[in-house]
Amino acid sequence: MVKQLSDQAADDTLWVTGVGQHQMWAAQLIDFKRPNSWMTSGGLGTMGYGLPAAIGAAVGGNGRPVWLIDGDGSFQMTSEELAAAFFDHAPVKIALLNNSVYGMVRQWQTLFYGQHYSATNLLDGEAHGEEGVKLEANGDMPVEVPDFVKLAEAYGCVGMRAFTKDEAIACIKKANEINDRPVLIDFRVWKDAMVWPMVAAGASNDDVTYMPGIKPLRDDTTGEN
């Protein structure tokens, strides 16, 4: 999905992220065409940074398109700023990678804490029904709290949702054609998708893990690859 965003974006697009797995995927997969086009909180870990930063980029960007790539957890820290985006005429385009969990925290709990999941399930998308929890409305429809499409529409923005690759491509194309108001696309992402490579907390960067159980081969004497 991030690769599709990059492929369909204009060369002068300003890219903004929140904090989480989506931030890492964006850094890995976006093909930046120009310098000074990347705004992210980096190692500060400031969840909620994305939307306010994207609004600022849109207001001060001299008409350059702005794509915010955010996660459902990070986005909800400052989602009320959709009102500011609407009233400030900041037509930001929001790609919401909705895996219904705090994905980065869940990844750590999977890899280092024996899959003991604590306080990571948001129940706003694909993860409802997990751990014995099942919420229903009208007898058969899973409850999503919040429904991000309705949330966007409540703030005067355009809301869309994509479950498949074809739907994602179509939504991105449509979003790129809308320039008079903010747009939010709720992309459904598998909750157990992980970011690779990674370095565990407290470990040296030399101790990088490429994939589960796969680390670089090194010479014991020189430390060379």
In which residue ranges do the predicted regions lie?
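Active-site diphosphate/adenylate-binding microenvironment
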Residues: M1-A57
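A short, conserved beta-to-alpha structural element at the edge of catalytic cores
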Residues: H89-H116
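A short alpha/beta connector and helix-capping loop motif
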Residues: E80-N99, W196-M198
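Alpha-helix C-terminal capping segments
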Residues: Q8, L29, A54-G63, A83-P91
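Glycine/aspartate-rich loop-and-adjacent alpha/beta segment that forms the canonical ThDP
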Residues: K150, K165-N225
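A short, small-residue-rich loop immediately preceding and capping a beta-strand
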Residues: G63-M77, V92-L97
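Short gly/pro/ser/thr-enriched loop/turn and capping motifs at secondary-structure boundaries
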Residues: Q23-M24, G45-M47, F75-Q76, S100-M104, ...
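Conserved thiamine diphosphate
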Residues: T110-C171
